[in-house]
Every structure is written in C-alpha cells, then in structure tokens.
Amino acid sequence: MKIMKLAAIAMAAVLPVTSAVAAFPEKPVNYVIPFGPGGESDITARHQQSFFKDKFGQDLVISYKPGGGGAVGWSQLNRMRGDGYNIMGINLPHIIIKPQQKAVGFQTDDITGIYMFHYTPDAIVVKNDSPFKTLQDLVDHAKKNPKKTTMSGSGKGTANHLAQVRFDKMAGIKTTYVAYKGTGKAVAALLGSQVNAEWGYTSVGAKHSDKVRMLAVAMDKRHPKFPDVPTFKELGYDLVSGAYRGIAVPKSTPAETRAKLSEMIKEINADPAFRAKMENDGMALLDIDAAGYNAFINEMTEVYMNAAREGGIIK
C-alpha cells in the first residue's frame, strides 16, 4: 500500500510537468542573437521566425545582444530563465575557439545546445576574371609562389581561417591569410583586387554570383544551388567545414523542455519551403538534435583545436 501511495505521489508530480511541456509554447519565445542585425545569424533566425509562428502558433521574438564576437551574449546565457521561453543562437567555431584564446566569460561546456540546424559551407572564391579557373590552378600557383597567394577571410580563428590552415596542410602549400572584420569586408577586398582569392562561404557565391566564381565548396556533396561547383572531397581533399549555427538554452532548462524545443526546430528544418529558402541563400541544412549535440561538439572541438594550434591561433 505504501509503495502504491508513493507511486501515486510520483505520478502526480510528473503529470503537471508533462502536461506543461505538451502545451508548450503558450506564449512568445524570446530568441536572442548574440550579434547585431543583418548578419547570417540574424538572417537564418528570420527564416525560422515565420515557420515557427505557422507551426506552433506563437511568435518567435528576435532580439540582439552583440559584443565580443558573440561572447557577451553567451556569457549571459545561463543567467536567463530556463523555462523554454529563452533561447539563444550559437555559432561554431566561436564557442569552441574563443574561450581558448582569452577569458570571455564562458566555457564551451557552459553552452547547452538543443539543435544545430545549418552551416554555411566554406568555399574558395575568386573574381570572374581570375586566372584561377580551377582549384588545381590555385594550388599550382601557391606551390610555385610560397606565401605569395593572398586570400582574404573573416577574421582570425573563424571558420574561414581554420579552413585555410587545414587546406594548406592537406595541399602542401603556404598561402597568406588576410583577416578582415567580417565577410563583407573580405568580399570587398576580393572584388577590389586587393587579394588573389577569398576563403569565403557559399553565401558569397549566392549573393555575388554575377561577380565571383567558387572553385570548390567544403561539403560532403555538391550544393544544390551550385551543381557545377565541385566539393573539396571530389578533388581529393577531405575538407567539410563552415560556419555552423544552432540554438542553445540556459542550463536550468528542464530536459523535457529541451527535447520539445529540439523537436520543434527539427520540424522547421524538415519543411521543404524552409529548406528551399535556406539553400537559395547558399546555406546547407544540418540536423544535430539535443541528444547528439555533445558528441558533435566533441568531434568538432578536436578538429578545430588541431587547426587552431597549427595556425598559431592558440598555444
């Protein structure tokens, strides 16, 4: 009898939680982007916004907490209320590399990810009139002219920079990476002929298709928007990389709520209209849910840390 009473009490305690999670969301969800408006983190959140409303009946309210390349926002994530109504965008390699460079107010393990939903693949980009018609052309030039092949990119320790370090090692070349503050300035340097090429993203190819060409994209398979552009893997280089984006919640968020949010983002990702919108912008969909998040981060940490040490980004 005593056991039955205890079981009844336990069941009663579980039911309200389960019921609340089943009804979630019952009000707007606050989606914090740890960067300013207009960047890809903002653009992809805006893409999610309308689908969230249509599927779940509540608004996804986007706000911004820029600073420190995302660090200001991530350092405050766990101070937010963990009720499922506060979520924050996360980026790789940022959340892995930044804490290794200096004190930024958070460690990678402080981030509780519930879904990695896409990445913008790295790509080597050249102007339409570039003498480099293929990736091999660029590699041959770099081998004959060590450190004289200049390539712009978005900052040190970014996805672009780590891709440059990794590819140089794979190809047996030494190029010179010229870091700019943001993709926009790196593209401007390319278009202004200040560099020979750019370590950019597939989104650059989508946005500036009338002015640039991509020699290769860092994907497992060719991007559907760019069927004529080969992957690095096709050309003999095992390089799949880019700027990965996902969503995290405060650590205090209950496991049931994390799982529910994870399923919601998965549902948006599966929508053909959402996929088409993302791919048209040059992005690639990814489906790493809450259950697979830690394993994914561990795998990427090893890749990024090796490249960061190789490139002198961290000691």
Where are these predicted regions, by residue range?
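Hinge/capping helix and adjacent helix->loop/strand transition within the periplasmic-binding protein
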Residues: 52, 76-86, 99-181, 185, ...
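Bacterial N-terminal signal peptides that target proteins for export
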Residues: 1-8
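An extracytoplasmic/periplasmic, membrane-proximal ligand-sensing/linker region
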Residues: 26-28, 169-175, 255-315
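C-terminal lobe and pocket-closing loops
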Residues: 119, 203-270, 299-302
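Short coil/turn segments
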Residues: 38, 92-93, 127-132, 153-158, ...
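Bacterial N-terminal signal peptides
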Residues: 8-16
